[in-house]
Structures are given as C-alpha cells and as structure tokens.
Amino acid sequence: YFNEDKLDKYLNLKLCFLEQANDKPFNLGSLNNAGFLINEDYLDYLVVNNIDFLPMIADYRYSESPSLLIKHGYNNLPIVPSKNSRLIVKSPRRENVFLGSVLLPKNVFKKVNGYSNSYWGWGFEDTDMRRRLEVNKININYRDGFYQPLIHDNLGYEINDEKKVVPTKYHIDNQKTFNENWNNDENYLKDGINSFKFEILSNQEIYKNMRNDALFEIRHIKVNF
C-alpha cells in the first residue's frame, strides 16, 4: 500500500510497523511505547495509527497539541464478520475517544508517561491515554481525516446465545484495570514509558530514500515484552 503512490517519498519521516512477537495477548499500549522509545532520539512528534485504519485522506502535519486525526471511518462495524453476522458496534463520539490514528508531540508523550502497559487483549489503552491528557489539562485537537476501516472480528465484543452484543472477557478485565488505575490520578506516573522493558528481535528496512536532508524510511520492527 505505502510502496505504491500513497506517500511522498521525499518527506522527512520514518514509518514503522511494530509487531508484538510473542504468544501473549495483544498489548497495543506497550507496542506504542516501544515505537516511541526506539525512535525517541530524533523525532519531534509521532503518529500512532492502528493497523486496521487505512488512511485515505489524512493530515499528519505537526501540531503542538495532541490531535485525533480520524473524522470519517468510525463506522458502525460488524462484531463477527467471519460468521456473516449483521450485529454491529455503534460508532463512538470522537469527543469521547482518542483512538485509531492520533498525533502526539514528543513533549506531551513524555509528560503523560506514554501509554499504560496494563491493558492486554483488547481496548482501554486509548481511553487511558485520553484520561492522561485530561488530568494534565492538555487540549485535544480534531482533524478531518478520512480512513478506511479494515473489517475483522472484534475482540472487545461478542454475540451471546440470545443474539445480543455483550463485552468479552478482555473488555471486562480491562475495564476493571482502567477503574483500578484511575482510583488515583497519579497512578499513571508509575505505568508507562518509565516502567516499560522490552527487547528488539528484528529491525528490518523495507524502503529507504534520501534526498538532500530528507530521509524517508519504512521499517518492520518485531519486539518482545
């Protein structure tokens, strides 16, 4: 997708595909922290783009404030498309979320201690990040990006025997973790990039182009934590 014509190869940017290479449940917050720490020395801001949101029209320009980049793309998504189910999760109000594709200045990311490492399986690392911004009284900007959601089975919701949409165990467990984490507004200071340990298993160059002082690079990085 990105090797075709979707990006200007003369921009000064680094595009990293982070892969969690272990048998543990998925932990998006830790993956995001790994991406930041690997590239911290030379970045001035980062964009966290979930792999299941494909940018069609997106504004990735620098902002001094954290920014939610998606406006169109939080469609009513099917719960279990692999079973041809028509039951859906309703689109969230974007004033209540900070997910999908978000921009975070380096100084803001460090101030809020990055993402929590406590959420395994599905969800709430984004809700936790929004709370970190809110308790630090950091305003969130909103841009008008258009993204194509890539449809897949939802790990946060399932369909019970009565054909109703209910939260999965991952959802329930992470909701409990979120409530425990935020029984004190200072707990986030102990859970984030300052407490995260990981190892880089591989760091593969996919594409590289140098022109004048601009380096455009695509890398696939596997990490374990």
Task: Show which residues each predicted segment covers.
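Conserved donor-nucleotide/metal-binding helix-loop-beta segment in metal-dependent transferases, i.e.
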Residues: 55-87
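Active-site-proximal specificity loops/subdomain of glycosyltransferases
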Residues: 4-43
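Conserved nucleotide-sugar donor-binding catalytic segment
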Residues: 104, 114-119
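C-terminal catalytic/acceptor-binding lobe
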Residues: 118-121, 125-225
